[in-house]
């Protein structure tokens, strides 16, 4: 229901000519401003509603390649990367989802995000964010930066990202396990040469342990990694 409401709101906001550009600018102005009560440690998560809404709307808008290109030209990636380190989990998760939405299928956005250091930041979130909502969003963004993107894959390998992906297979959180298994399956399918380093880093016992766990969405892709 929330997704349907968001799509309807975006459609209404984009009814006129040039409306998408104006809406991108409006949302970025929201994100550039401080969250209400940001200095108060006791502040509840609900106070970030304006920023969360702006991130969600931007992610919806940036599913259009034209809007994603415009978003990058407005400096949106720089704003989003700062929010990856925000103290409140919904903003970190929303920033990661927006980054993935913008980079998906847009080489220019991928290259810009990689040049800005998005991948090490996302891997840091994937390694150690304490909130279970955030790592799956980070993994989505990582996938959008490394699949069919040679520079992104090169960075992933250099940063030890393959080991991080393998470790995510052992997460206690099913959504993260499923995303990690899917990405590893895709990478092995697209780049068979990755089999050797992944096996060396313990992929086989990790994938086997995944298959022995309670059945969930990760099993099919976990089996796929073993069959590669």
Predicted stretch roles:
Residues 1-5, 39-59, 88-103, 115-116, ...:
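Alpha-helical solenoid repeats of the armadillo/HEAT superfamily
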Residues 14-19, 67-74, 109-116, 134, ...:
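Short, hydrophobic/charged alpha-helical patches characteristic of ARM/HEAT alpha-solenoid repeats
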Residues 1-41:
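Intrinsically disordered, low-complexity regulatory regions
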